[in-house]
Amino acid sequence: MVFVTIIIIINISYNIYNIYTINENRFTFNAFLQSKKASFTFICIYVCISGGNMPLWAYILFRTFLHPSSSSNSVLCFRRHNQDYHNRIFFAFCCHHIWSLLPHHLSIFPIRRQFYLNSRQ
């Protein structure tokens, strides 16, 4: 948990620095939210809040659906996806929570499956 917190702090600092330099030495929170690098920050925060209990497919879903213009590294090129950006974050969160509510997903992870079987006895 401490390691994840350190990664979050480093990542947010790095993102702020990047956006500060891209926007001619001005930092705006809106530009941070629209940057591609912000997605990793959201992933780190979510993993930290959920105690690290996030399946790998949810991470892949985040990386796939969050970046419609994956070849672009510019914040300015990402502005046209502003509305989609929040919808895709919401979609990824919903998919993960629906998946975590299903009991059959425990059979995919052997440790969690054993814990699930022991708790039912």
Curated annotation (Swiss-Prot):
<protein>
    <recommendedName>
        <fullName>Putative uncharacterized membrane protein YML047W-A</fullName>
    </recommendedName>
</protein>
<feature type="transmembrane region" description="Helical; Name=3">
    <location>
        <begin position="89"/>
        <end position="109"/>
    </location>
</feature>
<keyword id="KW-0472">Membrane</keyword>
<dbReference type="GO" id="GO:0016020">
    <property type="term" value="C:membrane"/>
</dbReference>
<keyword id="KW-1133">Transmembrane helix</keyword>
<keyword id="KW-0812">Transmembrane</keyword>
<feature type="transmembrane region" description="Helical; Name=2">
    <location>
        <begin position="42"/>
        <end position="62"/>
    </location>
</feature>
<feature type="transmembrane region" description="Helical; Name=1">
    <location>
        <begin position="2"/>
        <end position="22"/>
    </location>
</feature>
